[in-house]
Amino acid sequence: MIANISPLAPSYTPELPAIDGITLRTVCAGYKNWQRNDLSLFLFQPNTVVAGLTTQSACPSPEVEWCRAAIKKGKARALVVNAGNSNAFTGHKGREAVAAITARVADHLKCALHEVFVSSTGVIGVPLPIKTACDGLEKAFSAEDVNWEHMANAIMTTDTFAKMSRQDITIQGKSVKMVGIIKGSGMIAPDMATMLGYIFTDAAVAPELLQKMLTKANKKSFSCITVDSDTSTSDTVLAFATAAAGNPILSSEEDKDADKLQEAVTAICLDLAQQVVRDGEGASKFISVSVNGAVSDESAHIIAMSIANSPLVKTAMAGEDANWGRVVMAVGKAGQPAERDLLSIRFGGIEVAAKGMVVPNYDEAPVAAHLKGKEIDISVDIGLGKGQAQVWTCDLTHGYISINADYRS
C-alpha cells in the first residue's frame, strides 16, 4: 500500500452489507516484513456456486491454473488471497504452495479440493513460502470475523485506497445483495479478466448462467480499461453466489428478473474497473476515450485501446498538452480501417481536428482549460461506419516511474 491516496479516489466509501452464507477473516501471515494483514480467507456455505475469468497471459501463475480447472466444477467453499507475493513463475515450488494451501483448507472444511480457490498478488518470481501460508491459515481459521473493508484493504499491494462496490436488487420478490472488491493499480491491461477482483451475492443462480453474466460484464468493464498496457500473470475475477436470498434459482437468461442480475453484475464490474484506473500508479487524471464511426464495434475498441495505451498520449495528458497529433498517431498505428481525411478529434467535446487537419480558427484556450481538470474526455470519429467503443485509462506521470523503479526495494 502507498501512503498518499490517489487524487482520483472516490469521495466516499460505500457501506457494504454482510452477505448470508459468507464468513470473512484476514490475518498477518507475514509474507513481507510488515505489520499488516496479508492473508484473506473467505468461507462459503455449502452449495455456493462460482464463475470466473483469468488472465490470457502465456505465463500464468499456479493460482490461475488451479482456478481455471476448479471453476469448471462450479462449486466453492473457500477463497484464499495472499498479498505481497504473486507466486508466479516459480516452477514446481509455486505449484506445491498452491497444493498445500488448498489441501489445508479442504481438510479444515471437509470439502473437495476443487471447492477451494486461491489467488496471490505481489512480486513475480519468488515462491510463496508454504510454512508461512499454512501458519497464516491456522491463524485465520480461529480469527474473528471482519467486514468487507478489512478484506478490501488486506488484498492491496501498491493500491492507495480500498476498492469496493455494491448493488441491491429484487429477484422475483426476494431482496438480493451483491458486493464487489478488487485490487489493482499497476500492471493493468486486461484480456478476459484483470487484477484480482471478487464479486459476492446471495442470489440463487446456476453456475453456467453466472459464468455467462460475468463474461458479458467483463466485456463492458475490465476489458475496457488500461493503466500501463501490461497484462498481469495473476489476473483473476471470480464471482460467488450463495443462494441464501431464497429466490427461485435462475438458470436461463430468459428467466424472470435474470436481466436485473445481469445489470447488477455489469454495474459492479464497471464501478470496480474504473476505480482501478482512478488508482493507476502515479495517476493524476482519469481519461475516457470514445471512438465512433468505426467499421465495427470490435474495430472501435482496438482503436480506443491504441489511444489509451499510447505513452505519448498519456504523457501529453499529464502535461495538460492538447497535442491532438498524438491521437492521430495512435489511430493510425492501430491496424484498423481508418481514413485520414474523414477523421475528427475532440477534447472535452471541443473539436480540434477534422477532415485531415486542424479545424479552422482553432482556439486552444478552452481545450487547455479542460485538460487542467482531473476528468479528461477524448473523442474520435473515424467516419467509416457505425462501430463504437469506450475505454478508460489514466495519465502517465513521474509517479509511475518512481513507484515501479523502487517496487522491490
From Swiss-Prot:
The record marks A193, T194 as: Cleavage. Pathway: Amino-acid biosynthesis; L-arginine biosynthesis; L-ornithine and N-acetyl-L-glutamate from L-glutamate and N(2)-acetyl-L-ornithine (cyclic): step 1/1; Amino-acid biosynthesis; L-arginine biosynthesis; N(2)-acetyl-L-ornithine from L-glutamate: step 1/4. It is found in: Cytoplasm. Keywords: Acyltransferase, Amino-acid biosynthesis, Arginine biosynthesis, Autocatalytic cleavage, Cytoplasm, Multifunctional enzyme, Transferase. Substrate binds at T157, K183, T194, E281, N404, S409. It is an enzyme of class 2 (transferase). The active site is at T194 (nucleophile). Its main location: cytoplasm. The gene is argJ. Heterotetramer of two alpha and two beta chains. It catalyses: N(2)-acetyl-L-ornithine + L-glutamate = N-acetyl-L-glutamate + L-ornithine; L-glutamate + acetyl-CoA = N-acetyl-L-glutamate + CoA + H(+). One of its GO terms (cellular component) is cytoplasm. GO terms for molecular function: glutamate N-acetyltransferase activity; L-glutamate N-acetyltransferase activity. SUPFAM superfamilies: DmpA/ArgJ-like. The record marks T121, G122 as: Involved in the stabilization of negative charge on the oxyanion by the formation of the oxyanion hole. GO terms for biological process: L-arginine biosynthetic process; ornithine biosynthetic process. Catalyzes two activities which are involved in the cyclic version of arginine biosynthesis: the synthesis of N-acetylglutamate from glutamate and acetyl-CoA as the acetyl donor, and of ornithine by transacetylation between N(2)-acetylornithine and glutamate. CDD domains: OAT (cd02152). Belongs to the ArgJ family. This is Arginine biosynthesis bifunctional protein ArgJ. Its EC number is 2.3.1.35, 2.3.1.1.
